[in-house]
Amino acid sequence: MPEQGPRMNSFSLGELCWLFCCPPCPSRIAAKLAFLPPEPTYSVHTDPSGATSLHLTERADWQYSQRELDAVEVLVTRTSRGNRVGCMFVRCAPASRYTLLFSHGNAVDLGQMCSFYIGLGSRINCNVFSYDYSGYGVSTGKPSEKNLYADIEAAWQVLRNKYGVTPENIILYGQSIGTVPTVDLASRYECAAVILHSPLMSGLRVAFPDTRKTYCFDAFPSIDKVSKVASPVLVIHGTEDEVIDFSHGLAIYERCPRAVEPLWVEGAGHNDIELYAQYLERLKQFITFELATS
């Protein structure tokens, strides 16, 4: 998978003083900690009939054939905050029961993730629906915490209303910063399951590991929302994560009412969990067997 961005917690002394002496609003913290939109690696073309197609740049590092590229569905929808958000539907396993609603990391866009989605979906027998955050890829607006929540809500509505996928067949999958909108949506809607890959407790807790409570100016307070998630939750985290400390995954796991056996990947960092064999093994076990009996 493409790298998800540099350390989130490299702050200068001046920035530390700024945070504590002049506490900013959550949107300022969010922008400072999380959002690193790359130059777009794809575009969405619309022909005279209204049909859309995906066009990738070389930086997307496409790993499959033109036939498989042509099968990827793309569209643009509008959020409640007025932004246009790019969406992608990768039908890896047409006969599969489940579709992942995938929220990606902070330094990639759909073009860079597309090959990964095909590989993941085909291996765990799931279709993959994903979207770009405001300010990423073809999505308009600027990335912000409020836009994150509106973006995933818009994607959820497209998956539900355009494609007719019912909540009991949707698995919410969030990675890194993508766990933030995933937890928010899962705290409001029940679904088949939730997968939190390298989750964070909150923005301040990433920047300042000794933070023990959620302040009014904190951003991304997933630790306060995850207790409201009614669906089964699988937490995945590397024990040597250099961006979001392993303690975040452990704390999130302990707060989940319906947490299943987590996957703690010994020795894994923030961007290499997918390279370990137990990653796919745990996903297959969870989706194929555990959800069937939950």
Curated annotation (Swiss-Prot):
Palmitoylated on cysteine residues located in a cysteine cluster at the N-terminus which promotes membrane localization. It catalyses: S-hexadecanoyl-L-cysteinyl-[protein] + H2O = L-cysteinyl-[protein] + hexadecanoate + H(+). GO terms for cellular component: dendritic spine; endosome membrane; plasma membrane; postsynaptic density membrane; recycling endosome membrane. One of its GO terms (molecular function) is palmitoyl-(protein) hydrolase activity. GO terms for biological process: regulation of postsynapse organization. It is a lipid-anchor. Its EC number is 3.1.2.22. It comes from the Eukaryota. InterPro entries: AB_hydrolase_fold, Hydrolase_4. It holds the Pfam family Hydrolase_4. The keyword S-adenosyl-L-methionine does not apply. PANTHER family: ALPHA/BETA HYDROLASE DOMAIN-CONTAINING PROTEIN, ALPHA_BETA HYDROLASE DOMAIN-CONTAINING PROTEIN 17C. Hydrolyzes fatty acids from S-acylated cysteine residues in proteins. Has depalmitoylating activity towards nras. This is Alpha/beta hydrolase domain-containing protein 17C. It comes from Danio rerio.
